């Protein structure tokens, strides 16, 4: 691929829902394969890639709490869902010859390695795609927060959030035809306006560590490589 990438190392955050495709639940393997191909294109540009995937296509911890259940147990179940998704993505990457590893915030040595910042950066230095599973390993934190945390730990140049739409809008464009898309915002503007892109803890953590957030549609084939080359349609959240 041609074009010099704007970033050397990035953290990609993908929602669990993105893996569902047109299904109502679970993993659409064709979608996992497409995301894997996008990551392969990014690697062909020389960009080091870390990935955090949500678990909402399988389970959400807040769903337990909303029905009177134990939120901590629910969040633990959600963390396990992210491990399932991470293993699925690793399988898709393996099929196309991309070397990758899953590091979990929850110890499960028979399934994947445990996370450590030092090992994660070492793997990325070797050119491996590192998939971070298990969220932060703690309840009450979203996978958005986990993505911002891992981005800071690996010293990522940018946090890319692949969503259902091509950027940040003033309202849900699927519900409000008058919603306007922003080309750029500051972290403070996102927080002050309460824009639904990532939870406030994630945005604040990215701001504190001077990490730009780039929001784009994960459903565009080759979209990740386009963004990395500064060509794609997106919203950039940065204080610079």
Curated annotation (Swiss-Prot):
Superkingdom per UniProt: Bacteria
GO BP terms: 'de novo' CTP biosynthetic process; UDP biosynthetic process
Activity regulation details: Allosterically activated by GTP. Inhibited by UTP.
The protein's role, per its UniProt record: Catalyzes the reversible phosphorylation of UMP to UDP.
Chief subcellular location: cytoplasm
EC class of the enzyme, as a word: transferase
Keywords: Allosteric enzyme, ATP-binding, Cytoplasm, Kinase, Nucleotide-binding, Pyrimidine biosynthesis, Transferase
Subunit relationships: Homohexamer.
Location in or out of the cell: Cytoplasm
Residues binding UMP: 55, 75, 136-143
Pfam families attached to this UniProt entry: AA_kinase
Ligand binding (ATP): 13-16, 56, 60, 163-164, 169, 172
Stretch list, region Involved in allosteric activation by GTP: 21-26
CDD domains in the cross-refs: AAK_UMPK-PyrH-Ec
SUPFAM superfamilies for the chain: Carbamate kinase-like
An example molecular function term from Gene Ontology annotations: ATP binding
Catalytic reaction equation(s): UMP + ATP = UDP + ADP
InterPro entries found in the cross-reference section: AceGlu_kinase-like_sf, Asp/Glu/Uridylate_kinase, Uridylate_kinase, Uridylate_kinase_bac
Enzyme Commission number(s) from the entry: 2.7.4.22
Pathway: Pyrimidine metabolism; CTP biosynthesis via de novo pathway; UDP from UMP (UMPK route): step 1/1
Assigned GO CC terms: cytosol
The protein's name in its UniProt record: Uridylate kinase
Family: Belongs to the UMP kinase family.
